[in-house]
């Protein structure tokens, strides 16, 4: 079973927000996964869809059957955190953490039933 993957790195969205979405597409065919993501209203859905389309393009480069691909796994890891400050009362400042994510999509060919 041949596998192909694609990674989208340094995306400006928190990994916790993206992880909620990816559980809905794991194990589905690529076509069903894309349809599911297309109708989600979240910002992260568009980012995962872009990574999924990139993985499909990588599969085409490897001459794999695109119609028989299944989403084997989707990993969402935390990237570097951007630290910013917001002015507060009495001359103080509080830290704002702007989190980033790395999304890895792994596709595999569907196992043929004998």
UniProtKB/Swiss-Prot annotation:
GO BP: translation
Keywords for the protein's UniProt record, in alphabetical order: Ribonucleoprotein, Ribosomal protein, RNA-binding, rRNA-binding
Signal peptide boundaries: none
Record keyword Ribosomal protein present: yes
Entry GO terms, CC: cytosolic large ribosomal subunit
Single GO MF annotation: structural constituent of ribosome
Top-level taxon: Bacteria
Record has Cell membrane as a keyword: no
CDD domains: Ribosomal_L22
Pfam family, any one: Ribosomal_L22
Family: Belongs to the universal ribosomal protein uL22 family.
Subunit structure: Part of the 50S ribosomal subunit.
Function: This protein binds specifically to 23S rRNA; its binding is stimulated by other ribosomal proteins, e.g. L4, L17, and L20. It is important during the early stages of 50S assembly. It makes multiple contacts with different domains of the 23S rRNA in the assembled 50S subunit and ribosome.
HAMAP family xrefs: Ribosomal_uL22_B
Official protein name in the record: Large ribosomal subunit protein uL22
Organism taxonomic ancestry: Bacteria, Pseudomonadati, Thermodesulfobacteriota, Desulfobacteria, Desulfobacterales
């Amino acid at each position: 079973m041949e596998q192909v993957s694609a990674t989208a790195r340094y995306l400006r969205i928190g990994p916790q927000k993206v992880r909620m979405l990816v559980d809905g597409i794991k194990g589905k065919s690529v076509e069903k996964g894309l349809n599911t993501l297309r109708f989600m209203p979240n910002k992260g859905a568009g980012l995962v869809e872009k990574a999924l389309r990139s993985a499909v393009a990588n599969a085409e480069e490897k001459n794999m059957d695109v119609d028989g691909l299944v989403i084997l796994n989707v990993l969402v890891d935390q990237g570097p955190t951007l630290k910013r400050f917001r002015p507060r009362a009495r001359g103080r400042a509080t830290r704002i953490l702007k989190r980033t994510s790395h999304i890895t999509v792994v596709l595999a060919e569907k196992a043929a039933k004998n």
